[in-house]
């Protein structure tokens, strides 16, 4: 079990999870605010 924890905490695994999450977040932002260079809720 300790070996599995060590494997899952290595940098490539964490980087893959982080970049996958970030890509999904950017895709969802672009779905709701397409082609937004400045987001509508920041305009005054």
Curated annotation (Swiss-Prot):
Q: What is this protein called?
A: Photosystem I reaction center subunit IX
**InterPro entries with a match to the protein in the record:** PSI_PsaJ, PSI_PsaJ_sf
Pfam families named in the record:
PSI_PsaJ (PF01701)
User: Record's superkingdom?
Assistant: Eukaryota
Membrane association type: Single-pass membrane protein
Where is it found, in Gene Ontology cellular component terms?
A: chloroplast thylakoid membrane; photosystem I
Cell compartments where the protein resides = Plastid, Chloroplast thylakoid membrane
Does the entry feature the keyword Calcium, yes or no? Answer: no
Ordered alphabetically, the record's keywords are: Chloroplast, Membrane, Photosynthesis, Photosystem I, Plastid, Thylakoid, Transmembrane, Transmembrane helix
Q: Which HAMAP family match?
A: PSI_PsaJ (MF_00522)
Main site of residence?
plastid
Can you cite a GO biological process for this protein?
photosynthesis
Cite the Gene3D superfamilies for this sequence.
Single helix bin
Q: Which residues cross the membrane?
A: 7-27
Role, per record: May help in the organization of the PsaE and PsaF subunits.
Annotated family: Belongs to the PsaJ family.
The answer on whether this UniProt entry bears the keyword Transmembrane reads yes
């Amino acid at each position: 079990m300790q070996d599995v924890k060590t494997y899952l905490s290595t940098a490539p695994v964490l980087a893959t999870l982080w970049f996958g999450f970030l890509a999904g977040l950017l895709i969802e932002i672009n779905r709701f605010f397409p082609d937004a260079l400045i987001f509508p809720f920041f305009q005054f």
